[in-house]
């Protein structure tokens, strides 16, 4: 659902994130973080009926619920690489675990995290982590503007390729399928997402 952002600091936060995408030094990491919550392990009670000429795939509407999982995910903007882990919970502890994983995956150089305003992203534990890891800095998107976070593009792809038409007989199968997809995604010789949003108020030369 689209919501217009009424954040009083919208422009300042937006420009802060966009300057990372367009102007951050090339040797600095830009890592987008978020949680993909509510991934349902739905098992279809009957197999899909194959596509035929003039007729799309047909799917039985009945399914068995096996629970939900959450992907704690990170996306390296410049390298087009996904990393993360699947969890049954999403809270401050799991977010700090994600920060630890990002730090392990990128052991050298300065870096920037982009994330939304979920309360778990701005707790004392997170602030303590940032204080203990001064080479990393945190950048928040404006309220109701998570579309500025490039990991949402990756999450959308995961949803279409893995979840929408998937049938999972257990949480373990869903977990494994998501894990396998991250490996497949990173192995593809595709370029990073081509980010095109540029505020009209910005001089074009600033983005070249």
Task: Set out the residue ranges of the language-model regions.
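Short Lys/Arg-enriched helix C-cap and helix-to-coil transition segments
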Residues: 1-13
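Active-site proximal helix-loop segment of RNase H-like, two-metal nucleases, encompassing DDE(D)
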Residues: 82, 151-173, 184
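Short beta-strand segments
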Residues: 31-33, 112-115, 139-141, 196-197
């Amino acid at each position: 659902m689209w919501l217009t952002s009424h954040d009083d600091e919208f422009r300042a936060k937006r420009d802060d994130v966009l300057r990372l995408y367009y102007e951050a030094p090339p040797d600095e990491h830009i890592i987008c973080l978020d949680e993909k919550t509510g991934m349902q392990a739905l098992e279809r009670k009957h197999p899909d009926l194959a596509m035929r000429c003039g007729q799309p795939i047909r799917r039985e509407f009945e399914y068995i619920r096996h629970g939900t999982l959450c992907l704690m995910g990170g996306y390296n903007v410049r390298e087009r690489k996904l990393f993360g882990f699947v969890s049954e919970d999403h809270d401050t502890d799991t977010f700090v675990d994600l920060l630890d994983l990002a730090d392990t995956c990128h052991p050298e150089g300065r870096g920037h995290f982009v994330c939304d305003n979920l309360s778990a992203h701005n707790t004392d534990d997170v602030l303590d982590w940032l204080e203990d890891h001064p080479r990393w800095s945190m950048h928040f998107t404006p309220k109701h503007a998570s579309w500025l976070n490039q990991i949402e593009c990756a999450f959308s792809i995961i949803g279409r390729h893995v979840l929408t038409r998937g049938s999972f007989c257990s949480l373990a199968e869903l977990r494994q399928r998501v894990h396998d997809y991250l490996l497949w995604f990173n192995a593809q010789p595709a370029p990073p997402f081509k980010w095109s949003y540029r505020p009209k108020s910005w001089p074009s030369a600033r983005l070249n």
